[in-house]
């Protein structure tokens, strides 16, 4: 269970689950991961792609350490949530999860199936995800549950909340305004992390 406290927000327990695994969003939580001794694995990603565009070996050491730790615990949901070496509430991941739950309701209604449990879960998600909006910085942030720390990285994934449609026009307007400014001084549109 990735949401044992029923907050409506699920955790990712490995950066690979996010879909943007070598993002600087994960640098701080990953730096806290102690690499297991005598770790062994073989990389192929840096053989077919320019190694400068791939994570460093120390990053991969941490990825594999987390993966091995999850495997040792047999992926037991009760164990891994509490003891995972990496446990982050990711706004991008939760935005996609929220949107998928909303889409699921449409399907359930189409087939005249009960959607009350999911509707209640969505209400909880929409309420609690707003706790991750920083009014001063005017953006959402991820939260490192393991180390109890906010992750303030200006990631393009923070805008996925617009896709989830939380029906908060004030926040939506702020995000749209910020999104329009995201590329003003950049060579490429919508870089995953906004340069300073």
Regions flagged by a language model, labelled:
Residues 7-88, 126-196:
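Extended glycan-interaction surfaces of carbohydrate-active proteins
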Residues 85-99, 117, 121, 153:
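Short, contiguous, pocket-lining structural segments
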Residues 95-113, 160-170, 196:
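Well-ordered alpha-helical scaffold segments within catalytic/enzyme domains
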